[in-house]
From Swiss-Prot:
GO biological process, any: secondary metabolite biosynthetic process
Domain remark from Swiss-Prot or TrEMBL: The last Arg residue of the ACP-binding site is essential for the weak association between ACP/AcpP and FabH.
Function field: Catalyzes the condensation reaction of fatty acid synthesis by the addition to an acyl acceptor of two carbons from malonyl-ACP. Catalyzes the first condensation reaction which initiates fatty acid synthesis and may therefore play a role in governing the total rate of fatty acid production. Possesses both acetoacetyl-ACP synthase and acetyl transacylase activities. Its substrate specificity determines the biosynthesis of branched-chain and/or straight-chain of fatty acids.
Protein name: Beta-ketoacyl-[acyl-carrier-protein] synthase III
Taxonomy of the source species: Bacteria, Pseudomonadati, Campylobacterota, Epsilonproteobacteria, Campylobacterales
The reaction(s) this protein catalyses: malonyl-[ACP] + acetyl-CoA + H(+) = 3-oxobutanoyl-[ACP] + CO2 + CoA
Root EC class: transferase
Keyword Acyltransferase (UniProt): yes
Annotated gene: fabH
Claim: Transferase is one of the keywords in the record: yes
Length: 330
């Protein structure tokens, strides 16, 4: 191989509006203590009515491109992961975001892998770069999850937040600046555990069509149990495959869904406090944006430096899951 795929830059963005747990008490049977005890979440950010996922994503994307010392014209491909796209089916959020960046006549498409979306993005970008098809790939996890939440459902609406994270994936000849390994998987037999139904209305041809609300639905207990079991196995597998141990990893950056899930994996692998990046308490579950947001925050705080090895893992609707070993090439 002449070169490897490398994570050249990282940036994140969150909306300005903070929503604390206590605010849910105004319309739900819940409390700050109840939410924090079960999830580790203290607050989250919600976008304004005017903002869309692409608006959040473009801010992170501009900064990621700048940090990679590139311009939008240098980007060969744009891929966005989101469960809260700007439009229901088309155009893709990647196309909308590309236009806002001034990128024309370059391919752009979305990935639908829910909370595992960023791991899937890494897999796609790595393949495009290492095949020689692209030199610079922009990947973005952008979510306005508040647009798909049922604020009468205590089991879901307290968990999620809005935000975006973006990376530029380029080339390197150094293995220890590369995306070392990515593994992704799915099992559609559990698709009814976590899903967002389409809005259906009666038509002249099907007057009995069932009316559904397009809100995120989740079987919380079942998802929790499967997530812990699956992630433990997946993380052990990628470390063993690459002859690495937890102590070889500089930062463990899991999907920020629930503190209890993160803690279960952390304790099983005996990660130290300084190895683990946590943002769930501040931002909640931002789905496909959570890992790049956590990476971006670690970078801005000086915890993530060039050459550092990161272990990433995620689990989401589909059901989908995946993990990655990534050296920071920036």
């Amino acid at each position: 191989m002449e070169f490897y795929a490398s994570l050249k830059s990282i940036a994140m963005h969150v909306p300005s509006e903070r929503v604390k747990n206590a605010e849910f008490q105004q319309f739900l049977d819940t409390s700050d203590e109840w939410i924090e005890k079960r999830t580790g979440i203290k607050e989250r950010r919600f976008a304004s009515n005017e903002e869309k996922s692409s608006d959040l994503g473009v801010i992170a994307a501009k900064q990621a491109i700048e940090r990679a010392h590139l311009t939008p014209k240098d980007i060969d491909l744009v891929v966005v992961a989101t469960l809260s796209p700007d439009f229901l089916a088309m155009p893709s959020t990647a196309c909308v975001l590309s236009a806002k960046l001034g990128i024309e006549n370059k391919p752009a498409f979305d990935i639908s892998a829910a909370c595992t979306g960023f791991i899937y993005l890494l897999s796609v970008a790595k393949a495009y770069v290492e095949s020689g098809m692209c030199e610079n790939v922009l990947i973005v996890g952008a979510e306005k999850t508040s647009s798909v939440l049922d604020f009468k459902d205590r089991g879901t609406c307290i968990l999620f937040g809005d935000g975006a994270g973006a990376c530029v994936i380029g080339r390197t000849k150094r293995l220890k600046e590369s995306i070392l390994d990515v593994q992704i998987s799915a099992n559609g037999n559990f698709s009814n555990y976590l899903y967002t139904p389409r809005t259906l209305k009666p038509t002249p041809f099907n007057a009995k069509e069932e009316a559904l609300e397009p809100f995120l639905c989740m079987k919380g207990n079942e998802v929790f149990k499967l997530a812990v079991k699956t992630l433990l196995k997946d993380v052990e597998m990628i470390l063993e495959k690459n002859a690495l141990k937890p102590e070889d990893v500089r930062l463990f950056i899991p999907h920020q869904a629930n503190f209890r899930i993160i803690q279960a994996v952390r304790e099983h692998l005996d990660f130290k406090d300084e190895q683990v990046v946590l943002t769930v308490h501040k931002y909640g579950n931002t789905s496909a944006a959570s890992i790049p947001m956590a990476m971006g925050e670690a970078y801005e705080e000086g915890r993530l430096k060039k050459g550092d090895l990161m272990l990433l893992d995620a689990f989401g609707g589909g059901l989908t899951w995946g993990s990655a070993l990534v050296y920071f090439g920036g």
